[in-house]
């Protein structure tokens, strides 16, 4: 089994170039996507998706916070939009013109890393394209845990013990966005 990273971030669904869908269809599509991505082993959970209504679309966009379990790292989950998970690819292809902006922070305790990524997923000419806009990685330690906004030094010690006491681990995670 792969190591699992703890991930927090946002998905922004930009419908500016989606021509043939009503606002009701767009919201229904987001809810279907959230359901699909939330019911797998390496899930992505959008807690507010169920509460969306057509009036949730502002300036052709909807932004949702998410939490997830990354397969090794969350960039691997994002790659599934383009390749490797047919049901997800087919669903996304239904929304020709959509651009999804994904912004996240994560940490993984097996390989001891923190990462911050920005990706886009776009459907253009009936093809799903994934683009890495930025990716920053560093070692997970008390300093990066605090400076990347995952929590305080006290919280790090509570979760992991002193760096010298490793491998004490805790599954609790309360990340705060870097932005």
Label every model-predicted segment:
Residues 45-179:
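Charged interaction segments
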Residues 34-48:
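Surface patches in mature domains of proteins
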């Amino acid at each position: 089994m792969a190591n699992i990273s703890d991930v927090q971030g946002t998905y922004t669904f930009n419908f500016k170039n989606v021509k043939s869908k009503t606002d009701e269809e767009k919201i229904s599509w987001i809810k279907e996507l959230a359901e699909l991505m939330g019911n797998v082993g390496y899930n992505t959970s959008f807690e507010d998706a169920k509460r969306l209504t057509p009036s949730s679309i502002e300036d052709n966009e909807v932004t949702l916070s998410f939490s997830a379990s990354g397969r090794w790292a969350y960039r691997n989950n994002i790659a599934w939009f383009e390749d490797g998970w047919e049901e997800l690819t087919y669903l996304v292809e239904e929304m020709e013109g959509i651009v999804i902006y994904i912004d996240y922070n994560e940490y993984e305790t097996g390989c001891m890393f923190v990462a911050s990524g920005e990706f886009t997923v776009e459907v253009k000419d009936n093809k799903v394209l994934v683009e890495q806009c930025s990716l920053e990685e560093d070692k997970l330690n008390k300093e990066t845990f605090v400076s990347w906004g995952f929590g305080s030094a006290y919280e790090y010690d509570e979760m992991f013990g002193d760096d010298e006491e490793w491998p004490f681990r805790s599954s609790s995670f309360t990340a705060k966005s870097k932005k």
